[in-house]
């Protein structure tokens, strides 16, 4: 039985009712759970298995029975590893019901169904004597995230030791160490603070007001694939430094809040702006099985990994994982240090779920510190990517080139700016526009831009919450409609076609509206690629460490078909891929005729060798009709695409990705000959529908 759910269509801005399977929420939760990514992490799987084998063997040699508790069993793979290694009993718990039911089927299929006691509860809800007959003396769990403690590991381990484990219980992993490395990066700080905006001649157009300069920003982590940060875009100022250790085995409770003040020495002059963060775990009690999430330059096994992965780029020789990444934390007030060897104090905090940092020239007093938070509206309103966009020099220059020409071409230019947080619209006032009206429906964004306009003494700027507020006499005076475009509700690049929807609304008010529109057009491009790793998030597992997990694949595939969009947004600069052809234009949209339905189709010949496991998609915005490359602002590659080589992507926007279904092992040989990508696209702008279809075929096959 179908049901209806209300969703916001980002392209039309309207709430619409969408027919869904009655189990849609279930399918969405399964498809987005992300278990598959972990199961492709060969290092994690092998080291958990080795730790279980060594630990259980040592317990056996000591004459101890082995009673295992697996918290958050997922597919049941750790429970099966424990039994294979010789455990006497295994109890596993899983609170996510679809996963628990799948785990039971997987256990049955692998011959372990009657040997694992599966409890469909959270570990903190388990009752001794009811759910478990006795306490366990070996805990195996994967309760960690990028921040280590963000999924509640502290509380879960404390409860387990108090209620579920014996006094002498061992844990896998046994310990964790968190690392910090101070760094300076003009690139990364663009994700956190607002710079001045200057004209093409270097004249200052907009200065950030005091509220932005004094704001500490958000303490929340910025999780990234740190190894993909261009090596020439940052300087590390200190060696990697242990900041916190977590002993998961000790009976004594792990503290929920701690402070650690470290005296560190810089290796080169610079400004302490960022903290690079990662962690390392010792899976067994002896610390023989180490797993590090360090970026490649700080990885303890880099030399060995480089030898065994000599064909890969250096940044990709360390094991890839998307469930445990690295993080950037931004220092509230960057600390300038002038001499190599100079010392400073790094103040590190954690509570039960998160970490935060600060830097000081002199030793600060040890005292409880609250997490810093945004007080300027910028960080609470916009994403890291959007803040980076606002600072992006090359991008801004292309818009400013258009705006300078537009403003100076008329004796008095009157602009209507459509979009959220458009500083460039404010800049047009500083360039000499007669008046600027900014559409700003969001309160915090409107308040921020109002403060910037006031600080820069822009007297001819006004704000409206909707286009319907504009009176006919105001619309009649407008000479230019401008947008980047950017809207807060947008996820995929073409969601910003909401710009076209707003133009249609304006035409409804004044059908004869005659103005210059920028961007005047947009084009969607596609590029077939070979992802080095990203495709694994949608690739079937098959078998893992000798266990058959095809039932898990089937469950995820069924749910993905119901709940996962055919195209999803990904920051591709973090996920290397090789181009297999030149980009091809799929769709051209003219904003002076936005309401027209469009359909097109074609074929892309793959000209470079490699497995096509995805298609990257993006939008190029054409600012003016002059066809100059300087009039194009792209959300795709930042350099010319060369088939067979890695693509360099814009780092301040997410691209669209369509994953090509990965064949099973027995089909890969056949599919390797498929060298053509058929595509089709259907666009219905008034309904906010944009649908893609892609399929691989060999040149001898007929297209459908």
From Swiss-Prot:
InterPro entries: Arg_MeTrfase (IPR025799), MeTrfase_PRMT7 (IPR014644), PRMT_dom (IPR055135), SAM-dependent_MTases_sf (IPR029063)
EC annotation from Swiss-Prot or TrEMBL: 2.1.1.-
Pfam families the UniProt entry points to: PrmA (PF06325), PRMT_C (PF22528)
Taxonomic superkingdom: Eukaryota
Intrachain S-S bonds: none
Keywords of the record: Methyltransferase, Repeat, S-adenosyl-L-methionine, Transferase
Gene Ontology MF, one: protein-arginine omega-N symmetric methyltransferase activity
Annotated SAM-dependent MTase PRMT-type domain residues: 14-356, 366-704
Matches recorded under SUPFAM superfamilies: S-adenosyl-L-methionine-dependent methyltransferases (SSF53335)
Coiled-coil features, chain-numbered ranges: none
Biological process annotations from GO: peptidyl-arginine methylation
Signal peptide: none
Protein purpose: Essential arginine methyltransferase that can both catalyze the formation of omega-N monomethylarginine (MMA) and symmetrical dimethylarginine (sDMA). Specifically mediates the symmetrical dimethylation of arginine residues in the small nuclear ribonucleoproteins SmD1 and SmD3.
Annotated family: Belongs to the class I-like SAM-binding methyltransferase superfamily. Protein arginine N-methyltransferase family. PRMT7 subfamily.
Name of the protein in its database record: Protein arginine N-methyltransferase 7
Source lineage: Eukaryota, Metazoa, Ecdysozoa, Arthropoda, Hexapoda
Gene that specifies this protein: Art7
